Regions:
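Short phosphate-coordinating micro-motif centered on Lys-Gly-acidic
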Residues: 3, 103-108, 114-180
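Conserved lysine of the Walker
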Residues: 40
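N-terminal pre-Walker A segment at the start of P-loop NTPase domains
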Residues: 1-19
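Intrinsically disordered, low-complexity terminal tails and inter-domain linkers enriched
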Residues: 71-91, 178-180
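Hydrophobic anchor at the beta1->P-loop junction of P-loop NTPases
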Residues: 30-32
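Walker A (P-loop) phosphate-binding loop of P-loop NTPases
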Residues: 37
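Phosphate-binding P-loop
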Residues: 21-27
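Short beta-strand-centered segment that lines the nucleotide-binding/catalytic pocket of NTP-utilizing
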Residues: 53-69
Length: 180
């Protein structure tokens, strides 16, 4: 399933992230691709807000990974193919990866990062195209492109039943709300 959205501002990109983040329950893998300045980190900031994370979110360019935890437990939402899980914290974990400085995808395996992609937290990976061979078949890809100084194109590509249902709910919630 594919969904194309045009964002007209950073604020709108962040709101789109919030709407998607509100639907995440754990175990999701979201892969972000786009050139510098397309809004990958802005979208991730919105995702974190939607998940109930109040920390300042910035790109982990030099550390490859930053971990955040929401202050609230996720509200149960029935999404096909998803099994509710217990989290060791009050809320949901967000694992924010940035592969911009990654030289070899094997480094991620050597560092044990692959384990995160099959865990109970939400993984968001910026510059995901640098490690295409590592990703599970089922996932949500988001490709961002600059259209103008403030305008961005976001293409959501869902692979697998869980991610298709997630994208359907996101589309319904996004277009059912005005002022996006």
């Amino acid at each position: 399933m594919t969904l194309d959205i045009i964002s007209h501002s950073l604020t709108q990109t962040q709101r789109l992230g919030m709407r998607l983040g509100d639907l995440l329950r754990g175990g999701e893998l979201i892969l972000l691709d786009g050139q510098l300045g397309t809004g990958k980190t802005t979208l991730t900031q919105g995702l974190a807000q939607g998940m109930g994370i109040t920390d300042v979110i910035n790109s982990p360019t030099f550390t490859l990974l930053k971990e955040y935890h929401s202050s609230v437990s996720p509200v149960p939402v029935q999404i096909q193919g998803m099994v509710p899980s217990q989290h060791p914290y009050d809320g949901l974990a967000l694992y924010h990866f940035d592969l911009y400085r990654l030289d070899d995808p094997e480094e991620m395996i050597d560092l044990g990062f692959e384990d995160y992609f099959y865990g109970s937290g939400v993984c968001v990976v910026e510059w995901a195209d640098k490690a295409n061979l590592l990703w599970p078949a089922e996932r949500l890809n988001i490709r961002l492109k600059v259209l103008s100084e403030t305008k961005r194109s976001l293409r959501f590509i869902a692979t697998g039943a869980h991610y298709c249902e997630l994208l359907r709910l996101f589309q319904k919630n996004t277009y059912a709300t005005t002022g996006s």
